[in-house]
């Protein structure tokens, strides 16, 4: 009976695994001409998985009924919230890929299969209740991501991005494994509940180093300073649909996993990791903003923007309260929409031959040549900057509010001050598009799926998005409470 209950809880993961294997077989037998069909089937699988996990989120599932395989897997509402964000992000990335790869005659059915496998790994990551489960999910995601980064085999930038991601990712995995071995050595267990119980009271120096190494390994996955060095090169070199994927779904999974690890197995030793998270948050905000200022390549700029936004997300985690975690999830959801919209807009910047345009010089005067695209980008950039009344302001507001409520007034003040620096390079987007002389380089026609996603993202981050804040706040409060109950 217990096995049946456990299998029911992991049904979305089972469906994704079976679907991925079936799609691989279809690809092997039929060949590249099935690329679009495989993409549609992969997106349908992810949509079905999202429907399966939705009831756990809306009901606020938590406690023993959400535990599978003796604590190895947790299907609570916190995991469900993260999974829905991950699945929807992956679906968006599948929608935008064909138009990009078709121009290069590189649309292969392996792309949606790899996205599906990476998403399966992320799904396992956010539901991990054991260090071993954590590592299995993380590596399944990472191995698929390495291949995706170098998907354009004949493109030197893509190959370089894949190689850098692989080498630095392997280093991060080694650091994480070493930390896990120290935690196991000093607690005698890999189970989150067991580790939490063993770390009650005074923490040994060895266990403290284990916590530090585990968090360092996870910091690489979320691209937090000082483990951010791979992000600009990989984001610039990888195909833009892959970069979009990296900036959204894996970011959600890694942040959710970091929160679960910090508050579940290490929840009794908040003081051991809180200062680390505060440092990473402030360093990411400042270095992300400063690094972006001198960039001329738009993809590299958005990579630094991603690092900057991770800092704001980590402020919510640093608060280590239900309100802080809820604010973190709220910001994460808003960030996914902003990032997806921004990279879709970059995909739409191309000349008459379909060649991508990726520099500020290419978008000079865009408001006169492509006004709809320019206005959508304006909404997204101002929202990323946190300028009211756009929805990005609300994300920053709830994060800073949670920090103040947790008596971290100085952290909130420093975060607000640093966000002013970050606003500079977002405003540069607007200045170039609306006030520079037009160059009229953007001439290519855009795919319908691109326009649909871009307009949807622009509407969500507009003041109309505030209509969703009550509903979103209820979901994030439920998800955050479930993690604290599990802890």
Swiss-Prot record:
Q: Which GO terms describe its biological process?
A: ATP synthesis coupled electron transport
Q: Which family does it belong to?
A: Belongs to the complex I subunit 2 family.
MF terms from GO for this chain are: NADH dehydrogenase (ubiquinone) activity; NADH:ubiquinone reductase (non-electrogenic) activity; quinone binding
Transmembrane regions: 7-27, 37-57, 81-101, 112-132, 166-186, 207-227, 237-257, 276-296, 307-327, 329-349, 373-393, 407-427, 452-472
What's the protein called, per UniProt? NADH-quinone oxidoreductase subunit N
Q: What EC designation does it have? A: 7.1.1.-
Q: Which GO terms describe its cellular component?
A: plasma membrane
For the protein in the UniProt heading, the enzyme class is: translocase
Task: Please provide the record's keywords in A-Z order.
Answer: Cell inner membrane, Cell membrane, Membrane, NAD, Quinone, Translocase, Transmembrane, Transmembrane helix, Transport, Ubiquinone
Q: Its function?
A: NDH-1 shuttles electrons from NADH, via FMN and iron-sulfur (Fe-S) centers, to quinones in the respiratory chain. The immediate electron acceptor for the enzyme in this species is believed to be ubiquinone. Couples the redox reaction to proton translocation (for every two electrons transferred, four hydrogen ions are translocated across the cytoplasmic membrane), and thus conserves the redox energy in a proton gradient.
Organism placement in taxonomy: Bacteria, Pseudomonadati, Pseudomonadota, Alphaproteobacteria, Sphingomonadales
HAMAP family linked: NDH1_NuoN_1
Q: Where is the protein situated, by its record's location annotation?
A: Cell inner membrane
Question: Which reaction is the catalytic activity of this chain?
Answer: a quinone + NADH + 5 H(+)(in) = a quinol + NAD(+) + 4 H(+)(out)
Quaternary context: NDH-1 is composed of 14 different subunits. Subunits NuoA, H, J, K, L, M, N constitute the membrane sector of the complex.
The superkingdom of the source organism is: Bacteria
Per UniProt, what is the membrane topology?
Answer: Multi-pass membrane protein
